[in-house]
Amino acid sequence: MAAPQLFRALVSAQWVAEALKAPRSSQPLKLLDASWYLPKLGRDARREFEERHIPGAAFFDIDRCSDHTSPYDHMLPNATHFADYAGSLGVSAATHVVIYDDSDQGLYSAPRVWWMFRAFGHHSVSLLDGGFRHWLNQNLPISSGKSHSEPAEFSAQLDPSFIKTHEDILENLDARRFQVVDARAAGRFQGTQPEPRDGIEPGHIPGSVNIPFTEFLTNEGLEKSPEEIKRLFKEKKVDLSKPLVATCGSGVTACHVVLGAFLCGKSDVPVYDGSWVEWYMRAQPEHIISEGRGKTQ
């Protein structure tokens, strides 16, 4: 295994399978299943993990590893909370973390956890290209049952440049210091299809650009090539040479925008963590752009 491979954003299923056969004590590999689904889908990610997962993987619960004092879903936890949680899963400073999920798309929620590790200073982290779907398609080994990780010491320090707040986005409406890319489906962005959360109407932040996260993926669920992703950004009139911020419904699929830019050589894209849910709940009606009901009060 060549060392540079360990720091790539994406690793292949075959690479992971080979790495599991030949573990390295100097840089242990830890697989994390970061599956997460919108509540209305009725899927239990942890139960599905216990039914089948990649051998040696642990389950990373995005909702558990979050700020439970926030009124918004799975906002980033503080550094101590993240360090304790990651350590409980067996992640140390020396660990190469590889993250995947079990979504039908290939990758859905895993890029959120990839972004979280980087935000807290752990850059030896990769995503399994194509996710568990691709692993299964390759007929690679699977396990079942609960995971049992040996706890490890892990320290974390949040890099604030990875996050944008509601105040940052509000100020940018006039200042226009950065572009905003929204990864939700087109109908939710336009205001013509419902949001999956009760009490939240669809629409978008003024001046934002829509690139649904699925547009970063091939039909097989693999990540598109950097050349294809650069072309996608260009088609959407997003300038990768200028500041860019990612948003979505609640900060999960926004991380596909971060990943796409990263693969194109732009590693400085932050996430608006509260995303559309926070924006809708806090914004004035004139700051909700929608072809639907919008916001009346």
Curated annotation (Swiss-Prot):
Keywords: Acetylation, Cytoplasm, Disulfide bond, Mitochondrion, Phosphoprotein, Redox-active center, Repeat, Synapse, Synaptosome, Transferase
Tissue specificity of this protein: Expressed in the brain and retina. In the retina, localized to the inner and outer plexiform layer, the inner and outer nuclear layer and the outer segments of photoreceptors. In the brain, localized to neurons of mitral cell layers, glomerular, and external plexiform layers in the olfactory bulb. Also found in Purkinje cell stomata and proximal dendrites. In the spinal cord, localized to large neurons. In the cerebral cortex, localized to pyramidial neurons in layers II/III and V, and in layers I-VI of neocortical areas. In the hippocampus, found in CA1 and CA3 pyramidal cells.
Gene Ontology biological-process entries: hydrogen sulfide biosynthetic process; kidney development; liver development; spinal cord development; transsulfuration
Catalytic site: 248
PTM annotation (N6-acetyllysine): residues: 40
Residue sites binding substrate per the record: 188
Annotated GO CC locations: cytoplasm; mitochondrial inner membrane; mitochondrion; neuron projection; synapse
Tagged with keyword Electron transport: no
SUPFAM superfamilies (alphabetical): Rhodanese/Cell cycle control phosphatase
Modified residues (Phosphoserine): 35
Swiss-Prot/TrEMBL domain comment: Contains two rhodanese domains with different primary structures but with near identical secondary structure conformations suggesting a common evolutionary origin. Only the C-terminal rhodanese domain contains the catalytic cysteine residue.
Function: Transfer of a sulfur ion to cyanide or to other thiol compounds. Also has weak rhodanese activity. Detoxifies cyanide and is required for thiosulfate biosynthesis. Acts as an antioxidant. In combination with cysteine aminotransferase (CAT), contributes to the catabolism of cysteine and is an important producer of hydrogen sulfide in the brain, retina and vascular endothelial cells. Hydrogen sulfide H(2)S is an important synaptic modulator, signaling molecule, smooth muscle contractor and neuroprotectant. Its production by the 3MST/CAT pathway is regulated by calcium ions.
Oligomer and partners: Monomer (active form). Homodimer; disulfide-linked (inactive form).
Name used for this protein in its record: 3-mercaptopyruvate sulfurtransferase
Taxonomic path: Eukaryota, Metazoa, Chordata, Craniata, Vertebrata
